[in-house]
């Protein structure tokens, strides 16, 4: 059975502009031509062309010793004869997502959009319409195949934003130095009485 494949070609340039579009600092090839080649069968990717650029952001510092991986545009896509549902209209006006991973062998896996595909031995790249689809596929890759993954957001203007795992360690793992968000080191019984914060605009866990 013939299988359709996705292929993308990027042409990196030498300059690297700066922007505030990325949540952590990193540098990548500044301008890349995101072109989708025409496959033999109907492929899941769109034939529109994109310019992909990666910028650095200094507002949030990355943990020491961690350098976010660069998105390699020449990475081949898994072999898939079905459709990922397209990139939706949102990809033209907002963004789409790219997940990458490296497989030790060629093996079959379940697509988050339905159906089965064959991941290639070595690096794989898959474009999806939603971040949740990347998370669903990534969870499956880690739980069943013991494969690490990364995914990125690509904006219509070509900007690439590295998303996950943000500090190099997946969130369900303990990472020394990672700061907790919304932590209160007390039991719920030690919260103040709700009547004391009524109409103040605050919550009992804020005090």
From Swiss-Prot:
SUPFAM superfamilies associated with the record: Photosystem I subunit PsaD
Membrane association type: Peripheral membrane protein
GO CC annotation, single: photosystem I reaction center
Transit peptide: 1-54
Record has Membrane as a keyword: yes
Subcellular location(s) per record: Plastid, Chloroplast thylakoid membrane
Top-level lineage group: Eukaryota
InterPro entries: PsaD, PsaD_sf
Keywords: Chloroplast, Membrane, Photosynthesis, Photosystem I, Plastid, Thylakoid, Transit peptide
One annotated GO biological process: photosynthesis
Presence of keyword Nucleotide-binding: no
Family: Belongs to the PsaD family.
Role this protein plays: PsaD can form complexes with ferredoxin and ferredoxin-oxidoreductase in photosystem I (PS I) reaction center. PSAD may encode the ferredoxin-docking protein.
Protein name from the UniProt record: Photosystem I reaction center subunit II, chloroplastic
UniProt gene name: psaD
């Amino acid at each position: 059975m013939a299988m359709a494949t996705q292929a993308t070609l990027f042409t990196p340039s030498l300059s690297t502009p700066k922007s505030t579009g990325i949540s952590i600092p990193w540098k990548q090839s500044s301008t890349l031509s995101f072109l989708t080649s025409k496959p033999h069968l109907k492929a899941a990717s769109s034939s529109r062309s994109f310019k992909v650029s990666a910028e650095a952001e200094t507002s949030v510092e990355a943990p020491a010793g961690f350098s976010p991986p660069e998105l390699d545009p020449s990475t081949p896509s898994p072999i898939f004869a079905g459709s990922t549902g397209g990139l939706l209209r949102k990809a033209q006006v907002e963004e789409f997502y790219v997940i990458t991973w490296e497989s030790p062998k060629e093996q079959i896996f379940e697509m988050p959009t339905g159906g089965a595909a064959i991941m290639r031995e070595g690096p794989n790249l898959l474009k999806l319409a939603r971040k949740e689809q990347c998370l669903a596929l990534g969870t499956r890759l880690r739980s069943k195949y013991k494969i690490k993954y990364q995914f990125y957001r690509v904006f219509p203007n070509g900007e690439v934003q590295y998303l996950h795992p943000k500090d190099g360690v997946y969130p369900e793992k303990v990472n020394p130095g990672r700061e907790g968000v919304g932590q209160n080191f007390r039991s719920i019984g030690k919260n103040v009485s709700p009547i004391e914060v009524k109409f103040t605009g605050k919550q009992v866990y804020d005090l």
